[in-house]
């Protein structure tokens, strides 16, 4: 069985006009410009986000914890938007600080020791053209594509060995979510963290920030907006027993459980404090049958404390292939897709190949 992230990749192939799959490896542009504000002056929340992002770029815990430095950076970012009418991005902001230099001290009434320009320019140069992390801020056509997609997949597996980069990318992604999901309350958006157990432990050694605390905050915030957030884990034992895990559980309104073993069921009952015995029995009753005449899968769904049900999913052969994660079948579908250029066509061709194989076996 392949990773479930491959399923999201295959779905994005099936709906290329409505979806986007970004497998970020650090060697190509990310395609997100957090400094972009569509010609509007950024509000206080946006300014705070940009300040936090620049502080991450700066990578100095001492500066992050120095109120004077943070206030100075806030003033400079605000003045940047006042002075520069368009073309906002981090490289442009960097050049603005470089160009204005020590004149900023006088213009903004900042003491030199309250903002170390030389340190900023030296450390943050890694995010400029030619720098080690230049692709984080490099312009890309993907930026426009993201504005017009309903389903976006960010694959960060290839950079998981760089906790600092992951922390930076997550900050940028959350800003994108803020703009795409939360800014328009007429549209309900959903954020899903797949294979979350692997990523929750990642911690930025410079700022001390970790993914788990950030996601816990996201749960709390999205619950108050017209949005939803979900995390996918194999077992709750994979999550640390701390305030952030408890916060995520407390803010979980819908619980989904796939068929598992008794240990996983018992962990779920304990973590979510499920007292209703009928809910527990219902959860433990679910089964999958992929070898029958009509293959199906079952899932237990619990709506907070009030209601629980089991849903059985039977799919047509075409839809079953669209959600396929089996290694052999997935690889064959991808092979046909590369030739056909369409996942829909690949599924039909795969069915035809299977039918021919079956007819050949029957005629022997």
Briefly describe each language-model feature range.
Residues 2-18, 22-227, 240-243, 291-294, ...:
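P-loop NTPase motor domains
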Residues 233:
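H-loop/switch region of ABC-family ATPase nucleotide-binding domains
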Residues 236:
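Aromatic-lined carbohydrate-recognition surfaces of secreted/lumenal glycan-active proteins
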Residues 184, 239-364:
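C-terminal regions of RecA-like/P-loop NTPase motor modules
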């Amino acid at each position: 069985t392949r990773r479930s992230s491959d399923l999201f990749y295959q779905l994005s192939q099936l709906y290329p006009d409505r979806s986007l799959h970004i497998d970020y490896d650090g060697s190509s542009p990310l395609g997100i410009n957090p400094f972009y504000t569509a010609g509007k002056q950024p509000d206080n929340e946006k300014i705070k986000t940009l300040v936090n992002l620049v502080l991450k770029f700066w990578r100095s815990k001492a500066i992050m914890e120095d109120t004077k430095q943070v206030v100075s950076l806030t003033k400079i970012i605000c003045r940047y938007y006042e002075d520069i009418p368009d073309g906002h991005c981090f490289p442009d902001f960097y050049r603005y600080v470089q160009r204005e230099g020590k004149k900023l001290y006088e213009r903004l009434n900042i003491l030199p020791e309250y903002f170390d320009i030389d340190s900023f320019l030296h450390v943050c140069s890694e995010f400029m053209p030619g720098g080690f992390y230049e692709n984080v801020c490099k312009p890309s056509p993907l930026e426009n594509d993201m504005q017009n997609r309903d389903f976006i997949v960010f694959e960060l597996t290839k950079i998981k060995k760089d906790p600092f980069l992951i922390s930076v990318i997550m900050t940028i992604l959350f800003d994108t979510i803020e703009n795409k999901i939360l800014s328009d309350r007429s549209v309900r958006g959903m954020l899903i963290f797949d294979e979350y157990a692997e990523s929750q432990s990642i911690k930025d050694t410079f700022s001390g920030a970790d993914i788990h605390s950030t996601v816990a905050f996201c749960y709390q915030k999205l619950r108050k907006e017209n949005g939803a957030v979900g995390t996918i884990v194999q077992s709750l034992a994979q999550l640390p027993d701390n305030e952030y895990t408890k916060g995520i559980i407390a803010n979980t309104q819908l619980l989904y459980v796939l068929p598992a073993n008794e240990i996983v069921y018992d962990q779920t009952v304990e973590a979510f404090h499920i007292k209703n015995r009928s809910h527990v029995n219902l959860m433990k009753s679910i089964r999958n049958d992929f070898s029958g005449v009509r293959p199906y899968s079952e899932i237990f769904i619990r709506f907070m404390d009030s209601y629980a049900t089991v849903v059985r999913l039977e799919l047509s052969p075409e839809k079953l292939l669209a959600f396929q994660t089996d290694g052999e079948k997935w690889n064959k579908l991808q092979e046909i897709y590369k030739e056909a250029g369409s996942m829909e066509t690949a599924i039909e061709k795969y069915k035809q190949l299977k039918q021919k194989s079956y007819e050949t076996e029957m005629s022997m």
